[in-house]
Amino acid sequence: MMNPVLEFPVTDEILTSFALAIGPDLQGYRNHIYRVLNFYCALRGNDGLPGEALQIAAAFHDLGIWTDNTLDYLPPSVRLVTDYLDSRQRGELKDEVSALILEHHKVRSYHSAYALTVEPFRRADLIDVSLGLVRFGLPRAFIKTVQSMFPDHGFHGMLIKLSARQFIRSPLHPLPMFRW
């Protein structure tokens, strides 16, 4: 199994620009992203950094939680990444990055445009959100290594609190980020 990647410069640059919005959850969110990106690389068999579109999508994929104070964060996250890509004249990445964000909580396998990046990203996020209970064939030892290198720092606890609050507010739509 490959060695975990220790730095994702594009992702870190983006996170730095949103540090105030993310506040005390910054380290937990950064580590979540690092775990997801490492799981993505392992699922794809990549050695080294994933492409720029992946690193950008990873940085923005849950960002709407903090910027818009909502668990229905996919549309705000796409809006933020679209503004980011426009400001850098990287419009050619919009479709792929938007698909990566919008479909990362799809319940079933993803088979549409950009499936070669979207599906492993979806799986990598699920590996992390499930705390490694869902593995998609990754060795348990690799998952544990990545988890120990990039500890939780309260990320999963924050998700549980937000989910409980969402359930109380809207019991018929408790997890608005999930896609069928």
Language-model regions, residue ranges each:
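Glycine-rich, flexible beta-strand/loop modules in the N-terminal catalytic cores of phosphate-handling
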Residues: 15-16
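An active-site-proximal "capping" alpha-helix that borders the catalytic cofactor pocket
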Residues: 36-40, 72-87
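Membrane-interface starts of transmembrane alpha-helices
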Residues: 90-95
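His-Asp-centered metal-binding catalytic motifs of divalent-metal-dependent phosphohydrolases/nucleases
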Residues: 50-68, 77, 98-105
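Divalent metal-dependent phosphate-bond-processing catalytic cores, especially two-metal-ion Mg2+/Mn2+ enzymes
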Residues: 2-9, 19-47, 60, 89, ...
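Hydrophobic alpha-helical segments of small multi-pass membrane proteins
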Residues: 81, 102-103, 125-126
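Short gly/ser-rich anion-binding loops that grip negatively charged ligand groups
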Residues: 26, 67, 71, 87
